[in-house]
Amino acid sequence: MRVFTLAPLALLPLVLARPSQRSSSPQKPIMADNGDLVMIPEGHEKSNLDEIIASSELLSLHRSLSEIESISNNEGSVGDFLVEYLERHGFTVQKQAVPLDGHEVDEEERKPSRFNVYAYPASSPSPEIILTSHIDTVPPYIPYSLSLPPTASTGSSSIDRRAIHISGRGTVDAKASVACQIIATLSHLESNPDTPLGLLFVVSEETGGQGMHHFSNSPLNTSPPTFHTVIFGEPTESKLVSGHKGMLHFDVHVRGKPAHSGYPWLGRSAVSEILPILSKVDSLGDIPESEGGLPSSEKYGKTTLNIGVMEGGVATNVVPASASARVAVRLAGGTVTHAKETILAAVRSASKNPEDVHVSFSAGGAYPPVDLDSDVEGFDVMTVNYGTDVPNWDIHDHDLPDHGKVKRYLYGPGSIFVAHGENEGLSVGDMEDAVEGYARLIRAAVGRSERK
């Protein structure tokens, strides 16, 4: 294992550039002022913001990751960067080829176009604690940029460096988690080199979780588990997540009979048939379960539905011969089977011509609410409504007693509210706080290792 000297975790937030040796330069050096305040000469804001990022191992790693476009199916370049970075810092790295979404594995291809990255210190080939996140992003690519909110200025020549805002696609979801997990791991290993830590960075989380499914079905997912803790990274506002809603997708297809719109009684309108069905479906989260609605729970609230896509008809002067809709369900309780039965019953009750209506559920990706561990002190705790890769990793601990089951934590910097938007971004302070949060989770997991 190569020796790597990393600034102690406590020093990571404030690794500032050294003063320039060129006394003739009109630009004053960046200087620490009262902890997180930094002197910025007027007119040099951009260059000095860049310098602050470059002077921090955490922030420069995050910038390098975010500057590489890695929209789902195009994660190869960011994977190559991670492999080189982790090997340079003493990790043994395995690349796990993952076929592109909708494609088969090309066995003849020597270099996979994309791959999961699985890494561990040479001294610990069987990690007991694994930190994981994803390296793909949603489209479109938005370049990395830095800005200084007006509230960050504390005077004519100083700013609060923690308030520096970092923007761009993936800066939050989830390259912030990736960078913070790596730095927290390196910092822990610097003083505890024998800790059995591992890192797993997967592709395709945003498009169905093929990367995590691929890892889950591989020999690396040991049975029974050789690991006892998994720390998942997603934007959680640096709060510990005690669980998230389940997920179910389905399509409604309606067949009609075309006719001239001047004589609609000669046909059957598929649109007129699907509208009351969708109205009924859309209300299932607000109907009590005892009256045919979908379940709610104290922990997750109501089940919610989103009719995301509707299609029907070909022209205004033609009675529509077909109509369809695609619906996403965020389950707050119950089982997937029960939810499907409830949806089918609602569709039947709202159909005038049930024989013309067909409901199809997505073959994969359906799961009930996911409960997670939140037993580490020092965190605010919340639930979230979005889906993650957690259910895509089938951990083989189902037959183990409760005290032997794998702990699963979900934590990370940034907010889901901006994660897929044009305003995706977070602050330097968010990043630095998350490194300490991951470090705290690692320390708690190490305590379990020592009690084994």
Swiss-Prot record:
Q: Say yes or no: keyword Zinc present.
A: yes
Q: Indicate which residues the UniProt annotation says bind Zn(2+) 2.
A: 173
Q: For Zn(2+) 1, which residues are the binding ones?
A: 173, 206
Assigned keywords, A-Z: Hydrolase, Metal-binding, Protease, Secreted, Signal, Zinc
Location within or outside the cell: Secreted
Enzyme category, top tier: hydrolase
Checking Gene3D superfamilies in the record gives: 3.30.70.360, Zn peptidases
Active site residues of this protein: 205
The stretch of residues making up the signal peptide is: 1-17
Q: How is the cofactor bound?
A: Binds 2 Zn(2+) ions per subunit.
What GO molecular function annotations does the UniProt record carry, in alphabetical order?
Answer: metal ion binding; peptidase activity
- Superkingdom of the source species: Eukaryota
Q: Name one Pfam family in it.
A: Peptidase_M20
Query: By its UniProt entry, which InterPro entries does this protein fall under?
Result: Bact_exopeptidase_dim_dom, Peptidase_M20, Peptidase_M20_dimer, Peptidase_M20A
CDD domains, sorted: M20_ArgE_DapE-like_fungal (cd05652)
Q: What is its EC number?
A: 3.4.17.-
Q: Which family does it belong to?
A: Belongs to the peptidase M20A family.
Protein name, per record: Probable carboxypeptidase CPSG_08841
Natural source organism: Coccidioides posadasii (strain RMSCC 757 / Silveira)
